Amino acid sequence: MAAAAAALADDGDGIVDRAMWLACAAPNSGRLPAVGSMVFYFVDGHAEQFCQFPAPLLEQLAVPGPRVFLCTVAAVRLRADALTNEAYADITLDPVADHDVPRLLPAPAPAAAAGGQQQQLRYFVKTLMSSDAEYRDRFAVPMDVAKDVFPPLVDAKAVQPLIVKDLQGSPMTFDYGRNGNRVTLAKVWKKFRDDMDFVDGDSVIFMRRRDDDELYVGVRRQRTLDKPLRTRRSRPPTPLPVAVQEVIAAAGRAAAGEQFTATYRSRQDGDEFVVPREVVEEGLRLRSRFTPEMEVEFVWALEDGAPPSVGPHGKITAIHDTTWMWRSVEIGWTGGSEMNKYANFWQVRLVGSDDFASAAPPPPLSPKRLKSSEQCPSRPPEPLPGRVFLCKVTAVRLDATRNELFATMSLIPVARDQAIQPQAPADPGPSSPQVQTTLVSFVKPLTCTDAVKNRYRFIVPKRETAMGVLPQLQLNEHVPLYIKDMHGKEWVINYTWKEYTHMLSSGWIKFANANRLVTGDNVVFMRSMDSGERYMGLRRTLKPEPVSVDEVIEAVWRAARLEPFEVTYLSRQDGDEFVVPCGIVHNALRAKFTPGMVVNFVWAVEEDRLPNVGPQGKVIAIENYATSIWRMIQVEWPSCAGMNRYVNFWQIREVLGESSFEASTCIVRSQDYSPAPQRNLVNALQLPDGTKQLQQNKKSVSSSSTFRLFGKKMTPGVPPRRDTSGLSGQVSLFSHYLPHDEDDGQVPTMRQRLETLFPDNI
């Protein structure tokens, strides 16, 4: 049976073997299934072979549903089209009934000859431009590209005959010569070009087999043919291998459980519609991680066990809950990529993650899906305790990535029966003085003009804005400005004043390019009042990169086991603190919010200052989530505010005069604050209204002490769930958990749930 299966794998026209077929396929596509393996057949992908948007066509033609089938590969025959000279594969599939589905086993190993054939084939590919396809009577390619495929020239100044066969075995004799550092094919090239009717974007593939030393030429068409091809006079017309009738017939036979054959020609990246079962099922496990606004990268799975090839990056714009799963992830690719904006969930992975469908571990499953420890061997099999944890802060470390500051917080979960009271941090002794840097700063958001049109210079907003930060200049004066970034690197930038405009000129473009500044990024200039040194930092407009999904998953499960863990916090959005002092949370329980109430957003700031009052809005709904207290209150803000409409109850307070202030003290009572004018380096890099400043700069706190954060005593912290409305960062998918009442199976009320966290304070 093994010999028969191997024979079926490459049983075709006798010329096209597996190595030649892969050479003619799209560069990062063309994965052929192994005979005898379990695969999923996607009807929509099959229809894509002749139609860019197959779903409406399939519905119009009444293709019977469903449109995805689990099958066994019965045969793979490799052929070449007589009209287009393209290699394609006829894949014969046997549908598998639901009751016949076996346990998931590893796919059969490809035949040993496959790897040997690929090593015995040398080839190069050239994509034809308009001059190659329409005007030139000869084919030219750099000598370095063709030296391993074309034979060496006997006489560099003369031409010699070169016999090349097409994929049907028909020989063509070219005039083979040299022109400078390029080799050329003439004479027969014009006839071959006319017979193939090349268009701009088509590719030709020249191949040489080492065993017989014969040359072959194949063609890869750009996606679909825009016009019918002219037929060679010496050959009868042959219809295209993929037709509408074939797709309809294949879908009907698959639905009836009958064997069928599908034609696959690889023209674009990631167009495989016969996908190994294990790849799809692993991708299904990873699918729950994806949410809009996440940054992902396209990943191609290659042949012969090769590691996956990483493609362009992009951001998820939408996830479509399509019935048959085909191309359900919509992605906005960066860098002008021509990739299809609709991708399959097994073809993408999160940026910075090693997870991919063919080799990715399963993500942590929800309590409803945790049926045995075998499903997630590295995770606890018991139900998770909830989405919020009472913790003690043991350390806060400050660092920078690409000149943007972030904080790494070390937390130790506290069991409910060991709840601790907030304690004041120990006063530093005389041997460990606390260093506080006084800074003056200003911030400028980069417009399109700053980031694109005039990126060779930086316009200072106003002279008064930079006063105290940048040096004073006279008209037409320019001085070198020595300024350090957040990594300590010193930059020398020319600072000048011309025609009432202060600007940074020479040297600025180096900083902008090194940090890849884009429209919407904020540049923060700071000057130390003590040392006089100047600093330059950034606040990015894109999603945080230091925070990976793996980090959040690990934090959730370590917190569930009451083990120490670390979280990364990067401040880019107002009110996005997910580690909140317990005193702030239980003080907020005094508030009584109702729909229609007018409230202010209030930012809690560092250094015991008065809270900053933000925009005014109206409460329109109060959610009572079963397992979370994160962003429970929905507020209608003015359109100009740009605020997230879902807020936490400790972030708002009732507007004075509308109702009693004492009943809605959501952050901290005002008498708990005293103004402090100093601002440190971390404060300057935070958002304009002072949300989330860290008081201690690069200081670790011992486990026996507490830490002052947001101007409050911070011993335990509560990291709740991030918002999923599109304004959150990468931690919006996996969040922390809240206790359930497991005795009676009922979901406790919000106050009951908080009482379990703060039993002595409520």
Curated annotation (Swiss-Prot):
Domain of life per record: Eukaryota
Gene Ontology MF, one: DNA binding
DNA-binding span(s): 124-223, 443-542
Subcellular location: Nucleus
CDD domains per the UniProt record, alphabetical: B3_DNA
Main location as per UniProt: nucleus
Chain residue ranges for the region called Disordered: 359-381
Gene Ontology CC annotations of this record: nucleus
Listed GO biological process terms: regulation of DNA-templated transcription; response to hormone
InterPro entries hit by this protein: ARF_plant (IPR044835), B3_DNA-bd (IPR003340), DNA-bd_pseudobarrel_sf (IPR015300)
The UniProt record lists the keyword Repeat: yes
Alphabetized UniProt keyword annotations: DNA-binding, Nucleus, Repeat, Transcription, Transcription regulation
Pfam families according to UniProt: B3
SUPFAM superfamilies registered for this protein in UniProt: DNA-binding pseudobarrel domain
Protein name as annotated: B3 domain-containing protein Os07g0183300/Os07g0183600
